[in-house]
């Protein structure tokens, strides 16, 4: 694996030190542990997910400071990952636009000096239009709903293939797999999970 981007939910730079190179861009979304920082100056995020319903979550702010999204903003951990998400979504939107234009352009046979031109010059064969594909590798993350807002932005894209690695004692051990599936239901809902784990729209693979 030679990743272009790494979104770290960890507080250390272990991956960067052991496997990293200068061509990889990192985003420590939960902050980074550094020896010269203390409890007052560190930017480490320790919090909970949004547990309130949509109609009250922006009104009931009693426990706002404990929520992860608040701490990310307050501690300035950054949001480079949003640029990566935009790149994924914009690439797919451009692909859909080109496909719609190609399908809407009806081929017309033209005649000139007894020579036949089978297609208009502006016609684009839909089969020649390629959708930009991305692969998301997930290592060592429980997919807990506390990170739902971020994980969903990446996983729920039709041009993203998600490969989730999980620990097992042997080939038949599915204890961790069961927990991951349960957490994914909380992230995207059962219908979306079913669609993405089988059939023509499969985008999620457990490894």
Predicted regions and their residues:
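Extended, H/D-rich, highly charged conserved domains that either
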Residues: 1-90
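SIR2/sirtuin-family catalytic core signature
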Residues: 22-23, 100, 112-207
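A generic signature of intrinsically disordered, low-complexity regions enriched in glycine/proline
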Residues: 53, 64-66, 90, 104-105, ...
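A Trp-anchored, charged/polar loop motif used as the substrate-binding/catalytic surface
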Residues: 72-127, 145-146
